[in-house]
Amino acid sequence: MNFQENYDVIVIGGGHAGVEASLAAARMGSKTLLMTINLNMVAFMPCNPSIGGSAKGIVVREIDALGGEMGRNIDKTYIQMKMLNTGKGPAVRALRAQADKDEYAASMKNTVSDQENLTLRQGMVEELILDDEKQKVIGVRTSTGTQYGAKAVIITTGTALRGEIIIGELKYSSGPNNSLSSIGLADNLREIGFEIGRFKTGTPPRVLASSIDYDKTEIQPGDEAPNHFSFMSSDEDYLKDQIPCWLTYTTENSHTILRDNLHRAPLFSGIVKGVGPRYCPSIEDKITRFADKPRHQLFLEPEGRNTEEVYIGGLSTSMPEDVQFDLVKSIPGLENAKMMRPGYAIEYDVVMPHQLRPTLETKLISGLFTAGQTNGTSGYEEAAGQGLVAGINAALKIQGKPEFILKRSEAYIGVMIDDLVTKGTLEPYRLLTSRAEYRLILRHDNADRRLTEIGRQVGLVSDAQWEHYQAKMAQFDREMKRLNSEKLKPLPDTQEKLGKLGFGPIKDALTGAEFLKRPEVNYDEVIDFIGQAPEVIDRTVIELIETEITYEGYIKKAMDQVDKMHRLEAKRIPKNMDWDKLDSIATEARQKFKKINPETLGQASRISGVNPADISILMVYLEGK
Protein backbone atom coordinates (compact mmCIF):
# COMPACT_ATOMS: atom_id res chain seq x y z
CA MET A 1 0.00 0.00 0.00
CA ASN A 2 1.38 3.39 -1.02
CA PHE A 3 0.92 5.87 1.85
CA GLN A 4 1.73 9.59 1.70
CA GLU A 5 2.71 9.51 5.38
CA ASN A 6 2.61 6.96 8.18
CA TYR A 7 1.38 7.57 11.73
CA ASP A 8 0.84 5.57 14.87
CA VAL A 9 -2.61 7.07 15.48
CA ILE A 10 -4.96 8.97 13.16
CA VAL A 11 -7.90 10.82 14.73
CA ILE A 12 -10.78 11.75 12.41
CA GLY A 13 -12.59 14.88 13.63
CA GLY A 14 -11.34 17.87 15.64
CA GLY A 15 -14.21 18.37 18.08
CA HIS A 16 -14.11 17.83 21.84
CA ALA A 17 -13.56 14.07 21.58
CA GLY A 18 -10.98 14.46 18.81
CA VAL A 19 -8.75 16.96 20.58
CA GLU A 20 -8.62 14.91 23.79
CA ALA A 21 -7.95 11.70 21.83
CA SER A 22 -5.16 13.22 19.75
CA LEU A 23 -3.52 15.04 22.68
CA ALA A 24 -3.59 11.89 24.83
CA ALA A 25 -2.06 9.70 22.12
CA ALA A 26 0.63 12.27 21.29
CA ARG A 27 1.52 12.92 24.94
CA MET A 28 1.95 9.17 25.43
CA GLY A 29 4.55 9.14 22.65
CA SER A 30 2.49 8.12 19.61
CA LYS A 31 3.07 9.91 16.32
CA THR A 32 -0.44 11.29 15.80
CA LEU A 33 -2.39 12.95 12.98
CA LEU A 34 -5.59 14.89 13.72
CA MET A 35 -7.64 15.25 10.53
CA THR A 36 -10.57 17.66 10.59
CA ILE A 37 -12.92 19.02 7.93
CA ASN A 38 -12.28 22.65 8.89
CA LEU A 39 -9.29 23.95 10.85
CA ASN A 40 -11.38 26.93 11.97
CA MET A 41 -13.69 24.61 13.92
CA VAL A 42 -11.23 22.79 16.18
CA ALA A 43 -12.91 22.43 19.62
CA PHE A 44 -15.79 24.60 18.36
CA MET A 45 -18.98 24.82 20.45
CA PRO A 46 -21.85 24.50 17.96
CA CYS A 47 -24.51 24.53 20.69
CA ASN A 48 -24.36 25.78 24.29
CA PRO A 49 -21.43 28.10 25.17
CA SER A 50 -20.69 26.33 28.44
CA ILE A 51 -18.71 23.54 30.04
CA GLY A 52 -19.77 21.44 33.02
CA GLY A 53 -23.02 21.20 34.92
CA SER A 54 -24.61 18.32 36.81
CA ALA A 55 -22.48 15.15 36.44
CA LYS A 56 -20.76 16.71 33.40
CA GLY A 57 -18.70 19.04 35.59
CA ILE A 58 -17.36 16.03 37.47
CA VAL A 59 -16.38 14.45 34.14
CA VAL A 60 -14.29 17.53 33.32
CA ARG A 61 -12.53 17.19 36.69
CA GLU A 62 -11.88 13.52 35.90
CA ILE A 63 -10.42 14.42 32.51
CA ASP A 64 -8.11 16.89 34.23
CA ALA A 65 -7.06 14.40 36.91
CA LEU A 66 -6.11 11.89 34.20
CA GLY A 67 -4.00 14.46 32.35
CA GLY A 68 -6.54 15.70 29.79
CA GLU A 69 -7.03 19.24 28.55
CA MET A 70 -10.67 20.37 28.81
CA GLY A 71 -10.50 21.62 32.41
CA ARG A 72 -7.31 23.58 31.85
CA ASN A 73 -8.70 25.14 28.70
CA ILE A 74 -12.00 26.32 30.18
CA ASP A 75 -10.15 27.74 33.22
CA LYS A 76 -8.30 30.00 30.77
CA THR A 77 -11.35 31.08 28.75
CA TYR A 78 -14.45 31.25 30.96
CA ILE A 79 -16.54 34.37 31.47
CA GLN A 80 -18.51 33.02 34.44
CA MET A 81 -18.05 30.21 36.98
CA LYS A 82 -20.75 28.78 39.23
CA MET A 83 -20.98 25.82 41.59
CA LEU A 84 -24.35 24.09 41.23
CA ASN A 85 -26.41 22.24 43.87
CA THR A 86 -24.58 23.86 46.80
CA GLY A 87 -27.65 23.31 48.99
CA LYS A 88 -27.48 19.56 48.41
CA GLY A 89 -25.04 16.84 49.38
CA PRO A 90 -21.49 16.62 48.02
CA ALA A 91 -22.36 13.75 45.67
CA VAL A 92 -24.37 16.00 43.35
CA ARG A 93 -22.39 19.25 43.51
CA ALA A 94 -20.89 20.18 40.17
CA LEU A 95 -19.14 23.13 38.58
CA ARG A 96 -20.41 24.95 35.48
CA ALA A 97 -18.57 27.57 33.43
CA GLN A 98 -19.92 29.97 30.85
CA ALA A 99 -17.36 29.92 28.06
CA ASP A 100 -16.09 32.52 25.66
CA LYS A 101 -16.66 30.08 22.82
CA ASP A 102 -14.27 31.71 20.36
CA GLU A 103 -11.50 32.01 22.95
CA TYR A 104 -12.08 28.43 24.05
CA ALA A 105 -11.69 27.09 20.51
CA ALA A 106 -8.69 29.31 19.73
CA SER A 107 -6.90 28.33 22.94
CA MET A 108 -7.49 24.62 22.37
CA LYS A 109 -6.35 24.88 18.74
CA ASN A 110 -3.11 26.49 19.92
CA THR A 111 -2.58 23.68 22.42
CA VAL A 112 -3.10 21.07 19.70
CA SER A 113 -0.85 22.93 17.25
CA ASP A 114 1.97 23.23 19.79
CA GLN A 115 1.82 19.62 20.98
CA GLU A 116 4.88 17.49 20.24
CA ASN A 117 4.16 14.31 18.19
CA LEU A 118 0.87 15.81 16.92
CA THR A 119 0.13 17.03 13.39
CA LEU A 120 -3.06 19.02 12.73
CA ARG A 121 -4.35 18.90 9.15
CA GLN A 122 -7.48 19.93 7.26
CA GLY A 123 -9.06 17.21 5.16
CA MET A 124 -12.08 14.94 4.85
CA VAL A 125 -11.55 11.23 5.46
CA GLU A 126 -13.90 9.23 3.25
CA GLU A 127 -12.67 5.68 3.67
CA LEU A 128 -10.94 3.41 6.16
CA ILE A 129 -8.23 1.23 4.63
CA LEU A 130 -8.35 -2.33 5.98
CA ASP A 131 -5.90 -5.22 5.74
CA ASP A 132 -6.46 -8.05 3.25
CA GLU A 133 -8.54 -10.03 5.76
CA LYS A 134 -10.80 -6.99 6.40
CA GLN A 135 -10.22 -7.38 10.12
CA LYS A 136 -7.75 -4.60 10.93
CA VAL A 137 -7.51 -0.91 10.05
CA ILE A 138 -4.20 0.12 8.46
CA GLY A 139 -4.94 3.64 7.24
CA VAL A 140 -7.37 6.19 5.81
CA ARG A 141 -8.15 7.70 2.42
CA THR A 142 -9.25 11.34 2.06
CA SER A 143 -11.59 13.00 -0.46
CA THR A 144 -8.54 14.11 -2.47
CA GLY A 145 -7.33 10.52 -2.75
CA THR A 146 -4.41 10.94 -0.34
CA GLN A 147 -3.72 7.85 1.77
CA TYR A 148 -2.23 7.89 5.27
CA GLY A 149 -1.02 4.78 7.08
CA ALA A 150 -1.91 4.15 10.72
CA LYS A 151 -1.58 1.50 13.41
CA ALA A 152 -4.80 2.76 15.03
CA VAL A 153 -7.63 5.05 13.92
CA ILE A 154 -10.09 6.92 16.16
CA ILE A 155 -13.36 8.22 14.67
CA THR A 156 -14.61 11.35 16.48
CA THR A 157 -16.83 12.91 13.81
CA GLY A 158 -19.56 14.23 16.13
CA THR A 159 -22.76 15.12 14.28
CA ALA A 160 -21.04 15.34 10.88
CA LEU A 161 -21.66 11.71 9.80
CA ARG A 162 -24.31 12.14 7.09
CA GLY A 163 -25.39 15.28 8.95
CA GLU A 164 -28.53 17.11 7.83
CA ILE A 165 -29.75 20.45 9.18
CA ILE A 166 -33.51 21.01 9.46
CA ILE A 167 -35.33 24.35 9.81
CA GLY A 168 -39.05 24.05 9.14
CA GLU A 169 -39.52 22.42 5.75
CA LEU A 170 -35.89 23.13 4.79
CA LYS A 171 -33.58 20.13 5.05
CA TYR A 172 -30.06 20.13 3.66
CA SER A 173 -26.81 18.19 3.95
CA SER A 174 -24.59 19.80 6.59
CA GLY A 175 -22.53 19.20 9.67
CA PRO A 176 -22.90 21.46 12.73
CA ASN A 177 -23.00 25.22 12.13
CA ASN A 178 -23.15 24.77 8.34
CA SER A 179 -19.91 22.81 8.11
CA LEU A 180 -19.51 20.02 5.55
CA SER A 181 -21.34 16.73 6.08
CA SER A 182 -19.25 13.55 6.09
CA ILE A 183 -21.11 11.27 3.69
CA GLY A 184 -18.33 9.08 2.29
CA LEU A 185 -17.18 7.85 5.71
CA ALA A 186 -20.79 7.21 6.76
CA ASP A 187 -21.27 5.02 3.67
CA ASN A 188 -17.95 3.27 4.33
CA LEU A 189 -18.91 2.33 7.89
CA ARG A 190 -22.11 0.74 6.61
CA GLU A 191 -20.20 -1.15 3.92
CA ILE A 192 -17.77 -2.52 6.50
CA GLY A 193 -20.74 -3.95 8.39
CA PHE A 194 -21.39 -1.66 11.34
CA GLU A 195 -24.93 -1.26 12.67
CA ILE A 196 -25.69 2.44 12.20
CA GLY A 197 -28.40 4.41 14.01
CA ARG A 198 -29.87 7.83 13.29
CA PHE A 199 -30.08 10.41 16.07
CA LYS A 200 -31.12 14.05 16.27
CA THR A 201 -30.16 17.02 18.36
CA GLY A 202 -30.91 20.72 18.12
CA THR A 203 -29.89 24.23 19.06
CA PRO A 204 -31.80 27.45 19.89
CA PRO A 205 -31.81 30.83 18.15
CA ARG A 206 -29.15 33.43 18.96
CA VAL A 207 -30.16 37.06 19.50
CA LEU A 208 -28.37 40.42 19.49
CA ALA A 209 -27.27 41.37 23.03
CA SER A 210 -27.93 45.10 22.58
CA SER A 211 -31.54 44.40 21.57
CA ILE A 212 -32.42 42.66 24.86
CA ASP A 213 -34.34 44.46 27.63
CA TYR A 214 -32.53 43.02 30.64
CA ASP A 215 -34.80 44.88 33.08
CA LYS A 216 -37.48 42.28 32.33
CA THR A 217 -35.17 39.38 33.21
CA GLU A 218 -33.49 38.10 36.39
CA ILE A 219 -29.72 38.40 36.68
CA GLN A 220 -27.76 35.18 37.25
CA PRO A 221 -24.25 36.15 38.43
CA GLY A 222 -21.25 33.89 38.82
CA ASP A 223 -19.69 32.92 42.15
CA GLU A 224 -17.40 35.29 44.04
CA ALA A 225 -15.71 32.40 45.85
CA PRO A 226 -13.10 30.76 43.61
CA ASN A 227 -13.57 27.37 41.98
CA HIS A 228 -11.78 25.75 39.07
CA PHE A 229 -12.07 22.74 36.81
CA SER A 230 -8.35 22.03 36.74
CA PHE A 231 -6.61 20.95 39.92
CA MET A 232 -3.57 22.89 38.66
CA SER A 233 -5.41 26.25 38.50
CA SER A 234 -4.70 28.82 41.21
CA ASP A 235 -7.25 30.78 43.24
CA GLU A 236 -5.13 33.87 42.53
CA ASP A 237 -6.11 33.61 38.87
CA TYR A 238 -9.85 33.38 39.55
CA LEU A 239 -11.76 35.80 37.35
CA LYS A 240 -13.37 38.69 39.23
CA ASP A 241 -14.80 40.50 36.20
CA GLN A 242 -17.42 37.89 35.31
CA ILE A 243 -20.29 38.32 32.86
CA PRO A 244 -23.76 37.39 34.16
CA CYS A 245 -26.41 35.27 32.50
CA TRP A 246 -30.08 36.22 32.66
CA LEU A 247 -33.22 34.24 33.44
CA THR A 248 -36.54 34.66 31.66
CA TYR A 249 -39.50 32.43 30.79
CA THR A 250 -41.79 31.41 27.98
CA THR A 251 -45.33 32.81 28.20
CA GLU A 252 -48.80 31.55 27.34
CA ASN A 253 -48.45 33.55 24.12
CA SER A 254 -45.24 31.61 23.36
CA HIS A 255 -47.10 28.34 23.80
CA THR A 256 -50.00 29.52 21.64
CA ILE A 257 -47.60 30.43 18.81
CA LEU A 258 -46.04 26.98 19.03
CA ARG A 259 -49.35 25.08 19.28
CA ASP A 260 -50.79 26.98 16.33
CA ASN A 261 -47.83 25.91 14.21
CA LEU A 262 -47.22 22.33 15.35
CA HIS A 263 -48.40 21.12 11.93
CA ARG A 264 -45.33 22.90 10.51
CA ALA A 265 -42.93 21.45 13.10
CA PRO A 266 -40.45 19.01 11.51
CA LEU A 267 -40.55 17.01 14.74
CA PHE A 268 -44.22 16.19 14.17
CA SER A 269 -44.59 16.47 10.39
CA GLY A 270 -42.32 13.49 9.69
CA ILE A 271 -39.36 15.47 8.34
CA VAL A 272 -37.32 14.62 11.46
CA LYS A 273 -36.71 10.88 11.59
CA GLY A 274 -33.78 10.73 14.01
CA VAL A 275 -34.29 10.02 17.72
CA GLY A 276 -33.87 13.16 19.83
CA PRO A 277 -32.41 13.66 23.33
CA ARG A 278 -34.79 12.86 26.20
CA TYR A 279 -33.12 15.27 28.61
CA CYS A 280 -32.72 18.21 26.24
CA PRO A 281 -36.02 18.37 24.33
CA SER A 282 -36.94 21.09 21.87
CA ILE A 283 -39.38 23.77 23.01
CA GLU A 284 -42.09 22.37 20.71
CA ASP A 285 -41.57 18.98 22.34
CA LYS A 286 -41.72 20.52 25.84
CA ILE A 287 -45.07 22.24 25.35
CA THR A 288 -46.49 18.96 24.04
CA ARG A 289 -45.04 16.63 26.67
CA PHE A 290 -45.59 19.05 29.56
CA ALA A 291 -48.81 20.70 28.41
CA ASP A 292 -49.83 21.49 32.01
CA LYS A 293 -46.83 23.77 32.63
CA PRO A 294 -47.70 27.48 32.18
CA ARG A 295 -44.10 28.47 31.44
CA HIS A 296 -40.57 27.11 30.91
CA GLN A 297 -37.26 28.56 32.10
CA LEU A 298 -34.97 30.18 29.54
CA PHE A 299 -31.40 31.32 30.20
CA LEU A 300 -29.86 34.12 28.16
CA GLU A 301 -26.20 33.11 27.88
CA PRO A 302 -23.57 35.45 26.37
CA GLU A 303 -21.35 33.60 23.88
CA GLY A 304 -18.24 35.63 24.72
CA ARG A 305 -16.70 39.01 25.50
CA ASN A 306 -16.20 40.05 21.88
CA THR A 307 -19.49 39.00 20.33
CA GLU A 308 -23.04 40.31 20.50
CA GLU A 309 -24.54 36.83 20.14
CA VAL A 310 -26.62 35.56 23.04
CA TYR A 311 -27.70 31.92 23.28
CA ILE A 312 -31.29 31.30 24.47
CA GLY A 313 -30.81 28.20 26.62
CA GLY A 314 -33.98 26.11 26.80
CA LEU A 315 -35.40 27.28 23.46
CA SER A 316 -33.95 24.61 21.14
CA THR A 317 -36.19 24.47 18.07
CA SER A 318 -36.42 23.48 14.42
CA MET A 319 -39.63 25.41 13.75
CA PRO A 320 -39.82 27.47 10.52
CA GLU A 321 -37.87 30.72 10.76
CA ASP A 322 -40.97 32.95 10.65
CA VAL A 323 -42.37 31.07 13.65
CA GLN A 324 -39.05 31.53 15.46
CA PHE A 325 -39.24 35.31 14.91
CA ASP A 326 -42.67 35.42 16.59
CA LEU A 327 -41.63 32.99 19.31
CA VAL A 328 -38.59 35.04 20.35
CA LYS A 329 -40.64 38.26 20.55
CA SER A 330 -43.19 36.56 22.85
CA ILE A 331 -40.57 36.18 25.59
CA PRO A 332 -40.16 38.85 28.34
CA GLY A 333 -37.06 40.90 27.62
CA LEU A 334 -36.92 39.79 23.99
CA GLU A 335 -39.92 41.73 22.63
CA ASN A 336 -37.60 43.83 20.46
CA ALA A 337 -34.78 41.31 20.17
CA LYS A 338 -33.09 40.85 16.81
CA MET A 339 -32.51 37.22 15.91
CA MET A 340 -28.98 36.68 14.59
CA ARG A 341 -29.20 32.94 13.86
CA PRO A 342 -32.25 30.69 13.77
CA GLY A 343 -32.41 27.50 15.79
CA TYR A 344 -32.15 24.22 13.92
CA ALA A 345 -32.24 20.46 14.34
CA ILE A 346 -29.46 18.25 13.03
CA GLU A 347 -29.77 14.55 12.20
CA TYR A 348 -26.67 12.37 12.03
CA ASP A 349 -25.46 8.77 11.91
CA VAL A 350 -24.15 6.98 15.00
CA VAL A 351 -22.24 3.74 15.46
CA MET A 352 -24.50 1.81 17.84
CA PRO A 353 -22.27 1.44 20.91
CA HIS A 354 -22.96 -2.21 21.76
CA GLN A 355 -20.44 -2.87 18.95
CA LEU A 356 -17.63 -1.47 21.12
CA ARG A 357 -15.36 -2.93 23.76
CA PRO A 358 -14.91 -1.08 27.09
CA THR A 359 -11.70 0.37 25.60
CA LEU A 360 -13.87 1.97 22.85
CA GLU A 361 -12.18 -0.22 20.26
CA THR A 362 -14.70 -1.71 17.84
CA LYS A 363 -15.31 -5.45 18.07
CA LEU A 364 -15.53 -5.72 14.30
CA ILE A 365 -12.26 -4.04 13.25
CA SER A 366 -9.03 -4.30 15.24
CA GLY A 367 -7.32 -0.96 15.86
CA LEU A 368 -10.45 1.08 15.09
CA PHE A 369 -11.85 3.18 17.94
CA THR A 370 -14.86 5.52 18.09
CA ALA A 371 -15.63 8.27 20.61
CA GLY A 372 -18.09 11.09 21.30
CA GLN A 373 -21.40 11.74 19.58
CA THR A 374 -20.39 9.13 17.00
CA ASN A 375 -21.15 6.64 19.80
CA GLY A 376 -24.59 8.08 20.52
CA THR A 377 -23.82 10.43 23.41
CA SER A 378 -24.74 14.11 23.76
CA GLY A 379 -22.60 16.86 25.25
CA TYR A 380 -19.08 18.21 24.94
CA GLU A 381 -18.01 16.70 28.26
CA GLU A 382 -19.20 13.17 27.49
CA ALA A 383 -17.41 13.42 24.15
CA ALA A 384 -14.16 14.65 25.71
CA GLY A 385 -14.18 11.87 28.31
CA GLN A 386 -14.58 9.20 25.63
CA GLY A 387 -11.95 10.83 23.44
CA LEU A 388 -9.45 10.68 26.28
CA VAL A 389 -10.14 6.97 26.89
CA ALA A 390 -9.94 6.14 23.17
CA GLY A 391 -6.68 8.08 22.77
CA ILE A 392 -5.10 6.38 25.77
CA ASN A 393 -6.13 2.92 24.59
CA ALA A 394 -4.99 3.50 21.02
CA ALA A 395 -1.53 4.46 22.31
CA LEU A 396 -1.41 1.52 24.74
CA LYS A 397 -2.44 -0.95 22.02
CA ILE A 398 0.37 0.23 19.76
CA GLN A 399 2.84 0.01 22.64
CA GLY A 400 1.69 -3.52 23.51
CA LYS A 401 0.71 -2.45 27.03
CA PRO A 402 -2.35 -3.48 29.11
CA GLU A 403 -5.58 -1.74 28.15
CA PHE A 404 -7.11 1.12 30.11
CA ILE A 405 -10.64 0.57 31.45
CA LEU A 406 -12.22 2.80 34.09
CA LYS A 407 -14.57 1.00 36.48
CA ARG A 408 -18.02 2.31 37.41
CA SER A 409 -16.66 2.84 40.93
CA GLU A 410 -13.70 4.90 39.68
CA ALA A 411 -15.23 7.57 37.45
CA TYR A 412 -18.35 8.93 35.80
CA ILE A 413 -16.44 8.30 32.56
CA GLY A 414 -16.42 4.62 33.54
CA VAL A 415 -20.16 4.69 34.24
CA MET A 416 -20.85 6.25 30.84
CA ILE A 417 -18.72 3.85 28.82
CA ASP A 418 -20.05 0.82 30.69
CA ASP A 419 -23.62 1.99 30.05
CA LEU A 420 -22.88 2.45 26.35
CA VAL A 421 -21.12 -0.85 25.68
CA THR A 422 -23.22 -2.98 28.05
CA LYS A 423 -26.72 -1.55 27.67
CA GLY A 424 -26.39 0.38 24.42
CA THR A 425 -28.60 3.40 23.79
CA LEU A 426 -31.58 4.07 21.56
CA GLU A 427 -31.42 7.86 22.05
CA PRO A 428 -28.70 10.48 22.63
CA TYR A 429 -27.11 9.45 25.94
CA ARG A 430 -26.58 12.06 28.62
CA LEU A 431 -24.72 11.55 31.88
CA LEU A 432 -26.80 12.05 35.03
CA THR A 433 -25.80 11.63 38.67
CA SER A 434 -28.63 9.09 38.97
CA ARG A 435 -26.82 6.77 36.53
CA ALA A 436 -23.96 6.30 39.04
CA GLU A 437 -24.67 3.84 41.85
CA TYR A 438 -21.51 4.97 43.69
CA ARG A 439 -21.97 8.72 43.31
CA LEU A 440 -20.89 9.49 46.89
CA ILE A 441 -17.48 8.15 45.88
CA LEU A 442 -17.48 9.89 42.48
CA ARG A 443 -17.46 13.48 43.72
CA HIS A 444 -16.25 16.80 42.35
CA ASP A 445 -13.76 17.26 45.19
CA ASN A 446 -11.98 13.89 44.99
CA ALA A 447 -11.51 13.35 41.24
CA ASP A 448 -7.75 13.82 41.57
CA ARG A 449 -7.58 11.37 44.48
CA ARG A 450 -9.44 8.80 42.39
CA LEU A 451 -7.63 9.17 39.10
CA THR A 452 -4.32 11.05 39.11
CA GLU A 453 -2.30 7.96 40.04
CA ILE A 454 -4.03 6.01 37.25
CA GLY A 455 -3.23 8.79 34.78
CA ARG A 456 0.39 8.74 35.92
CA GLN A 457 0.62 4.97 35.41
CA VAL A 458 -0.52 5.17 31.78
CA GLY A 459 1.95 7.98 31.11
CA LEU A 460 -0.37 10.95 30.68
CA VAL A 461 0.04 12.92 33.91
CA SER A 462 3.00 15.31 33.68
CA ASP A 463 5.75 15.64 36.29
CA ALA A 464 4.37 19.04 37.35
CA GLN A 465 0.85 17.68 37.82
CA TRP A 466 2.15 14.64 39.70
CA GLU A 467 4.25 16.74 42.09
CA HIS A 468 1.29 19.08 42.71
CA TYR A 469 -0.95 16.11 43.48
CA GLN A 470 1.57 14.46 45.82
CA ALA A 471 2.03 17.71 47.75
CA LYS A 472 -1.73 18.08 48.16
CA MET A 473 -2.19 14.48 49.35
CA ALA A 474 0.72 14.83 51.79
CA GLN A 475 -0.94 17.90 53.31
CA PHE A 476 -4.28 16.05 53.43
CA ASP A 477 -2.65 13.15 55.33
CA ARG A 478 -0.90 15.48 57.79
CA GLU A 479 -4.05 17.42 58.62
CA MET A 480 -6.18 14.26 58.91
CA LYS A 481 -3.61 12.87 61.36
CA ARG A 482 -3.75 16.10 63.38
CA LEU A 483 -7.57 16.12 63.46
CA ASN A 484 -7.54 12.53 64.73
CA SER A 485 -5.09 13.34 67.53
CA GLU A 486 -5.95 16.86 68.76
CA LYS A 487 -8.85 16.82 71.25
CA LEU A 488 -11.65 18.96 72.63
CA LYS A 489 -11.75 18.33 76.38
CA PRO A 490 -14.88 18.83 78.52
CA LEU A 491 -13.41 21.82 80.32
CA PRO A 492 -15.56 24.80 81.45
CA ASP A 493 -14.23 27.20 78.80
CA THR A 494 -14.81 24.59 76.07
CA GLN A 495 -18.40 24.01 77.25
CA GLU A 496 -19.03 27.76 77.34
CA LYS A 497 -17.66 28.16 73.81
CA LEU A 498 -19.82 25.27 72.55
CA GLY A 499 -22.89 26.87 74.09
CA LYS A 500 -22.22 30.21 72.39
CA LEU A 501 -22.02 28.40 69.03
CA GLY A 502 -25.33 26.64 69.69
CA PHE A 503 -23.83 23.20 70.39
CA GLY A 504 -24.66 21.02 73.39
CA PRO A 505 -22.06 20.19 76.05
CA ILE A 506 -19.69 17.21 75.65
CA LYS A 507 -19.27 14.53 78.33
CA ASP A 508 -15.99 13.03 77.15
CA ALA A 509 -13.02 14.31 75.21
CA LEU A 510 -13.54 14.36 71.43
CA THR A 511 -10.95 14.39 68.69
CA GLY A 512 -11.26 17.12 66.11
CA ALA A 513 -12.32 14.48 63.57
CA GLU A 514 -15.06 13.15 65.87
CA PHE A 515 -16.38 16.67 66.37
CA LEU A 516 -16.33 17.29 62.60
CA LYS A 517 -18.50 14.20 62.05
CA ARG A 518 -21.43 16.17 63.44
CA PRO A 519 -23.39 17.34 60.37
CA GLU A 520 -23.80 20.90 61.72
CA VAL A 521 -20.05 21.37 62.31
CA ASN A 522 -17.55 22.62 59.73
CA TYR A 523 -13.76 22.64 59.61
CA ASP A 524 -13.37 26.28 60.71
CA GLU A 525 -15.42 25.60 63.86
CA VAL A 526 -13.21 22.62 64.72
CA ILE A 527 -10.13 24.83 64.31
CA ASP A 528 -11.62 27.31 66.81
CA PHE A 529 -11.21 24.57 69.45
CA ILE A 530 -8.04 22.69 68.48
CA GLY A 531 -6.10 25.57 66.94
CA GLN A 532 -4.66 26.31 63.52
CA ALA A 533 -2.40 23.87 61.71
CA PRO A 534 1.32 24.77 61.58
CA GLU A 535 0.89 25.33 57.83
CA VAL A 536 -1.69 27.05 55.63
CA ILE A 537 -4.17 24.34 54.60
CA ASP A 538 -5.29 24.59 50.99
CA ARG A 539 -8.98 25.31 50.41
CA THR A 540 -9.40 22.15 48.32
CA VAL A 541 -7.80 20.04 51.06
CA ILE A 542 -10.26 21.45 53.61
CA GLU A 543 -13.17 20.61 51.29
CA LEU A 544 -11.91 17.05 50.90
CA ILE A 545 -11.38 16.64 54.66
CA GLU A 546 -14.88 17.88 55.52
CA THR A 547 -16.53 15.47 53.10
CA GLU A 548 -14.38 12.44 53.96
CA ILE A 549 -14.95 12.83 57.71
CA THR A 550 -18.60 13.95 57.70
CA TYR A 551 -19.72 11.17 55.35
CA GLU A 552 -17.25 8.52 56.54
CA GLY A 553 -19.93 5.94 57.41
CA TYR A 554 -21.77 6.31 54.12
CA ILE A 555 -18.52 6.20 52.15
CA LYS A 556 -17.50 2.95 53.92
CA LYS A 557 -20.84 1.33 53.01
CA ALA A 558 -20.37 2.38 49.39
CA MET A 559 -16.83 0.96 49.35
CA ASP A 560 -18.14 -2.37 50.69
CA GLN A 561 -20.54 -2.48 47.74
CA VAL A 562 -17.65 -1.67 45.40
CA ASP A 563 -15.66 -4.61 46.79
CA LYS A 564 -18.54 -6.97 45.99
CA MET A 565 -18.77 -5.62 42.45
CA HIS A 566 -15.02 -5.97 41.93
CA ARG A 567 -15.27 -9.68 42.75
CA LEU A 568 -17.72 -10.06 39.87
CA GLU A 569 -15.53 -7.94 37.59
CA ALA A 570 -12.57 -10.19 38.38
CA LYS A 571 -14.31 -13.20 36.81
CA ARG A 572 -13.37 -12.99 33.14
CA ILE A 573 -15.47 -14.52 30.36
CA PRO A 574 -13.55 -16.25 27.53
CA LYS A 575 -13.44 -14.22 24.30
CA ASN A 576 -14.64 -17.18 22.26
CA MET A 577 -17.48 -18.05 24.62
CA ASP A 578 -20.08 -20.41 23.08
CA TRP A 579 -23.29 -19.09 24.59
CA ASP A 580 -25.35 -21.96 23.17
CA LYS A 581 -23.66 -24.29 25.68
CA LEU A 582 -25.55 -22.58 28.50
CA ASP A 583 -28.72 -24.63 28.09
CA SER A 584 -30.40 -23.47 31.29
CA ILE A 585 -30.34 -19.70 30.79
CA ALA A 586 -33.34 -17.79 29.46
CA THR A 587 -33.56 -17.27 25.71
CA GLU A 588 -33.52 -13.47 26.13
CA ALA A 589 -30.34 -13.67 28.20
CA ARG A 590 -28.63 -15.85 25.58
CA GLN A 591 -29.60 -13.40 22.82
CA LYS A 592 -28.29 -10.44 24.83
CA PHE A 593 -25.04 -12.25 25.67
CA LYS A 594 -24.46 -13.02 21.98
CA LYS A 595 -25.11 -9.39 21.04
CA ILE A 596 -23.00 -7.72 23.74
CA ASN A 597 -20.35 -10.43 24.33
CA PRO A 598 -19.64 -9.28 27.91
CA GLU A 599 -16.02 -9.52 29.04
CA THR A 600 -16.65 -10.05 32.76
CA LEU A 601 -19.32 -11.53 34.98
CA GLY A 602 -19.93 -8.04 36.35
CA GLN A 603 -20.61 -6.63 32.90
CA ALA A 604 -22.92 -9.57 32.12
CA SER A 605 -24.93 -8.85 35.28
CA ARG A 606 -25.64 -5.28 34.12
CA ILE A 607 -27.15 -6.19 30.75
CA SER A 608 -30.85 -5.31 30.64
CA GLY A 609 -33.02 -8.42 30.29
CA VAL A 610 -30.56 -10.64 32.17
CA ASN A 611 -31.82 -11.83 35.57
CA PRO A 612 -29.90 -13.07 38.66
CA ALA A 613 -30.70 -16.72 37.86
CA ASP A 614 -28.96 -16.37 34.48
CA ILE A 615 -25.90 -14.89 36.19
CA SER A 616 -25.82 -17.73 38.74
CA ILE A 617 -25.83 -20.30 35.92
CA LEU A 618 -23.08 -18.42 34.11
CA MET A 619 -21.02 -18.20 37.32
CA VAL A 620 -21.26 -21.97 37.89
CA TYR A 621 -20.27 -22.60 34.27
CA LEU A 622 -17.22 -20.31 34.50
CA GLU A 623 -16.07 -21.85 37.79
CA GLY A 624 -16.22 -25.28 36.17
CA LYS A 625 -13.98 -24.22 33.30
UniProtKB/Swiss-Prot annotation:
Name of one Pfam family that matches: GIDA
Main location as per UniProt: cytoplasm
Residues binding FAD, per UniProt: 13-18, 125, 182, 373
Source organism phylogeny: Bacteria, Bacillati, Bacillota, Bacilli, Lactobacillales
CC terms in the record's Gene Ontology section: cytosol
Alphabetical list of SUPFAM superfamilies matching this protein: FAD/NAD(P)-binding domain (SSF51905)
Stated name of the protein: tRNA uridine 5-carboxymethylaminomethyl modification enzyme MnmG
Keyword list, A-Z: Cytoplasm, FAD, Flavoprotein, NAD, tRNA processing
UniProt xrefs under PANTHER family: GLUCOSE INHIBITED DIVISION PROTEIN A, PROTEIN MTO1 HOMOLOG, MITOCHONDRIAL
